[in-house]
Amino acid sequence: MSYIRTLKRIRNKKTNYRKRKAILISRRNFITIKTSNENIHCQLIKPNLKGDIVLNFSNSKELAKYGWKGASNNLSASFLVGLLMGRKMLSKNNDSAILYTGKTSFTSKIAACLKGVASAGVKIPLSEESMPDENRINGTHVAKYATVLKQDKSLYEKRFSKLLDNNLDPEEYPKHFEEIRDKILSSSFDQPQQQG
């Protein structure tokens, strides 16, 4: 018997080479979405045999520039990161892409981010059945839960402490989401003119 060594990126569960091969053969730009405990990262990548080229990048820390006071790792933030990414893509004439998840599973945060990219006007194949509900994305469920919890003042302040510290009333969460979405849609992402 002999030992057949597997590639390091397979052993570390970083790369699915069947999906990777399909991406390289298609020669289309692809979007990767990574979620962590605190942030959501979205990248537009151009595949290349010598190494992938990152064309655009967006993460949930950028939402603070638009006045986002909510959490940076929930469905609302994920949708807004996708919307921001889609606007950046369109400003650089990248109007289509496909999703590449690699070894990570398709979660609701990834689906919300993908829905945000599609809402910006980017052509991306997606199924509406796998997308989260609009009420979950805009935070209506948070506002409803806050109105129920408001009767118990101590529990209300404990559960919504970060929102209250950021001067955001939890009942106004959907309204705040709409404001930030409108700011992202109305902002311009024009490329700076190259000199020379």
State each model region's role:
Residues 1-196:
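Ribosome-associated RNA-binding proteins
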